[in-house]
Amino acid sequence: MSVADIKKSEVVAQFARGANDTGSPEVQVALLTARITELTGHFKTHAKDHHSRRGLLRMVSRRRKLLDYLKGKDADRYRALIEKLGLRK
């Protein structure tokens, strides 16, 4: 397994609701947050990488949509996820 696969499985294991859960909103948001965090570090050294910045904005938008869905579906799970990921200040 590559480092990315190992990190991905750790995130899935941490946020999964069940044994084989990979598609719940919590897992999807956690994976997107991990990728967003990595890309944010990338932009500190490569400020003019506009192509990747567009991908970052798509990921942020997708995460926002998933969070809005979860907030409407189950507010308690939404608040727990936000606190666990440390997204809202």
From Swiss-Prot:
Subunit relationships: Part of the 30S ribosomal subunit. Forms a bridge to the 50S subunit in the 70S ribosome, contacting the 23S rRNA.
Job description of the protein: One of the primary rRNA binding proteins, it binds directly to 16S rRNA where it helps nucleate assembly of the platform of the 30S subunit by binding and bridging several RNA helices of the 16S rRNA.
Protein's name in the database: Small ribosomal subunit protein uS15
NCBIfam families named among the record's database cross-references: S15_bact
Record-linked PANTHER family: RIBOSOMAL PROTEIN S15, BACTERIAL AND ORGANELLAR (PTHR23321), SMALL RIBOSOMAL SUBUNIT PROTEIN US15M (PTHR23321:SF26)
Keyword presence, RNA-binding: yes
Gene Ontology annotations of biological process type: translation
A Gene Ontology cellular-component term: cytosolic small ribosomal subunit
Protein family membership: Belongs to the universal ribosomal protein uS15 family.
An example Gene Ontology molecular-function term: rRNA binding
InterPro entries recorded: Ribosomal_uS15 (IPR000589), Ribosomal_uS15_bac-type (IPR005290), uS15_NS1_RNA-bd_sf (IPR009068)
Keyword Ribosomal protein: yes
Keyword set, alphabetical order: Ribonucleoprotein, Ribosomal protein, RNA-binding, rRNA-binding
